[in-house]
Amino acid sequence: TGGDPLVLSPRRLREITERLAAIVHVQVVRFHTRVPVVEPGRVDAPMIAALRASGKATYLAVHANHPREFSPEASEAIARLVDGGVVLVSQSVLLRGVNDDVETLAALMKLFVQHRIKPYYLHHPDLAPGTSHFRLSIEKGQALVAGLRGRISGLAQPTYVLDLPGGHGKVPIAAAAIANGDGCWNIRDWQGQTHRYPPEDGT
């Protein structure tokens, strides 16, 4: 559904980032890419220097959807980026038949963290033409994300979001963990059990 800025030459990428440097109110620059996992050889010193040429805080969102995408070459490319001073976050799409089970998602998020990539967004599939076979229900997505809470640390948890059609932005859609009642809160844990807070006995 979009282009990839890292398919540009380092020269062209530097031209863009240097122009961003001149915009005073822009303090943070973020790029999104799949290049580190699909064409890791492109990630070299000139590209990394071009990414950082703005002199501003630079973040790179690495798009990956399955643990198998982390080839040795991809791992090396990611390490070059991090060691070169680029902060990495992740973006993944929840896809039926690809990563729609807790084990695969947990393994993917762990790999992100092991590669020094902070899990960021887990997208519900867009309504893009020709992709209906990848879509699953929001209810299933919510259940999968709830299942992650019992398997991986907080550092590895992504934010499950829906990008609303019509340009209305991204909205977190994980199932609500809390509900208010009688001045107390009923809080649901990762196993689906509900706990009263504060407890009735005050402990």
Region roles according to the model:
Residues 1, 61, 161-163:
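Extended hydrophobic secondary-structure segments that form protein cores and membrane-embedded regions
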Residues 3-152:
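Conserved AdoMet/S-adenosylmethionine-binding subsite of the radical SAM
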Residues 113-203:
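Auxiliary Fe-S-binding modules of radical SAM enzymes
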